[in-house]
Amino acid sequence: MTRLHNPLTVIAGLTRDPLRNRDTSSRLGDGGSLSAMTVKSVSVSFLVIVCLLFSSCAKKQDPVESLLSKMTLEEKCGQLACPIGFNFYGKDGDSLWVADDFLGMMDTLPLGSCWAVLRADPWSKKTVETGLHPLESARLLNMMQRHAVENTRLGIPMLFCEETPHGHMAVGTTVFPTGIGQASTWDPALLEQMGVVMGREVRLQGAHIGYGPVLDIARDPRWSRVEETMGEDSFLSGTLGAAIVQGMQKNVCATLKHLAAYGIPQGGHNAATAEVGPNRLMTDYLPSFEKAIVAGGAKTVMTSYNTIDGVPCSASGWLLQEVLRNSWDFKGVVFSDLNAVNAIYATQHVAVDPAEAAALALKVGVDIDLGGYNYGGFLKEALQRGLVTEADIDRAVRHVLQLKYDLGLFDNPYVDEALAESEVGTAESAQLAKQVALESAVLLKNDGILPFGENIKKVAVIGPNADNMYNQLGDYTAPQDPDRVVTMIEGIRDKGRAEVTYAKGCAVRDENDADIEEAVRIAKAADAVVLVVGGSSARDFKTSYEETGAAIVDEHLSDMDCGEGYDRSTLKLLGKQEELMQRIYAIGKPVVTVYIQGRPLDMNFAAEQSNALLTLWYPGMEGGSALADILWGDYNPAGRLPISIPRSVGQVPVYYSQPQTGDYVEESAKPLFPFGYGLSYTQFEYSDLQIEPAKAMSFQRGNVRGRESMADTLCKVSFTIKNIGLCDGDEVVQLYVRDEVASVTPASKLLKGFQRIHINKGESQQVTFYLTERDLSVYSKEKGWHVEPGDFTIMVGGCSDVNNGDAMKSKIQRS
């Protein structure tokens, strides 16, 4: 097991003894009492002491087992319940206190963990004013932790869990681009740095577990949570996810979400069933989790709400035991998603009552019930009814206690509150958020209008997402101080390169068109237009929410068209946005269209009519400053799509690796913009592709128990890339493999390597990839992962559409 860096080596804290109430007499008796020994010579005494030390070491009980043996059934059940915590405190001005709800719960069922104490958003009803700022957060969690340590029988410290999909979801923290934007960077090193910041901000405030990254493979853009994912490909998602995990786990535990196949729900409905067989699961939807566990060292995993072929993921022994524990050798803690254990009974109807639901989840390996309802309220009943054994309960408790020991919580469970005030949400962290936003921007079209030249002296900025900070931040975002967020219009104005005018034009969803005429007026007077459209995952305090926190679509009309619970039946821009676009394009001025979006929306009209087209996804707190740098050429965009942009919703699902098919009657079967696509202000040329057998060597990219031979390198792929354009820039080099004939229908191609590299104009660089047996393997239920003899086509280029002129191909044969 890879041991976490002890967070207390990073954050100095108070020193307490959480085990002070334990009976230590048994430990003293393990090796005998030195004071009772009578020793008559130095040599003999030395021998006796050495013998005693060895005897003590041999007999010393594992601390987890020692503690477990002292626990009552109620105390064990408490370790497995993780209730929602944002109502566990009160705040009035500078006064802060632990709520009676928490104290009462600890009296009846001493909790092992708590979720979302620091969460602030409309669901929690916490605002910038009523929520907790970093110093208050650290104070509160120290207070709650102190109560657990000093006022419960065994003094077991708690785990505090927080949401961290693109920054800690709390007031005053750093807000990065959402997952789909992070994936557009194709930059593992950058995302590891981001993970360090996210984990550090969580730990500085007293929490220990960050929920994220989200590694669901998203292949249905109607689904409301595409924005949280790393896109459609498991190799890209797993590589980037492992990097984020490694960054986060320098300070906290990362939680991989959501195991498994949550991103392909029937009809695009959140939490709907996934109809997929074991072969496709293993090849398409599970490798991202495997890589983040095996290569990234992830310590915790969260199950998903959905069923797979009718079996709830939180009740799947095949998924949580055979695959997760046995095949991937996972040793950590498994959380359910919020109320997912109860869903086994309440909505999936696989259990007759909450106690049976608790039993089903516990027996297959769900260690902690997020929400706590079933394990906290019904696990004891399940034991009494013979649905579980105490050994089943002990197994889960053992996992939880071991994680607490690994985190160092029994040595020091507290944090230095002053550091939270000074080191959360820093200017340096904001600069990193800007860098992620810059690298995530994908240029989809450019007829030469970008970057803006000296002739662009007056710019009209128009659109519903041009000056709305929450629309650019995405779901799972806390309320913000406006001074900490740079909107699109603010970034452009702050650039100071042109006179700037602004009109909203319309809202994202509202049908009011009263402001369109003003938008047309300022567009006519400008040298160029920046038209900022798209969607929004901005929650507000009028929206209704389910018990899980998912938004409920109702008659209330906000800008929100995306985010958990907001599934779509079309991908069209809503409200009057298309009318606004038509009116602006008809003027004939140069138009740069910018999409702020959480899912791939319909871009056909914009791609046809715009002079330039960008997607920034949800770019986070520095999105406006990033856009301005790109518009004026201070940064050369090089983001690449991690998900295909469909031409219409009728193509869905459309993804790069699906077996080739014929066209539709109405349109091409190809996406509007393919996976891996993105333009630059410069051009690159590929040449000199060489493939040669590599010397046998261990290659640590996915050693899985029983399959260590898969780590052997089979061949080396090298080629040269040259920047033949007029400016320096990044290129994302992509390597794809196609198995020409296999016992299971092969994908049309699969990504097996990528590098984001910077090349100065006129310069060349040699790029090398190593392909392993796993890269060329096929999975079958009967044989597992194995390489079959035959031909493989190797393709390299700047996009998954490797039939373009920039791509190179070659074949290798495996005998």
Protein language model features and the residues they cover:
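Long, compositionally biased low-complexity repeat segments characteristic
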Residues: R3-I11
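Generic short N-terminal amphipathic or hydrophobic helices
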Residues: V10, D23, L47-V48, Q690, ...
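A cross-taxon signal for low-complexity, glycine/charged-rich
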Residues: R3, R16-S43, L47-V48, R701-V704, ...
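Glycoside hydrolase catalytic-domain context in secreted enzymes
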Residues: F54-G702, R707, A711-V778, H786-V802
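Short beta-strand elements
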Residues: V802-S815
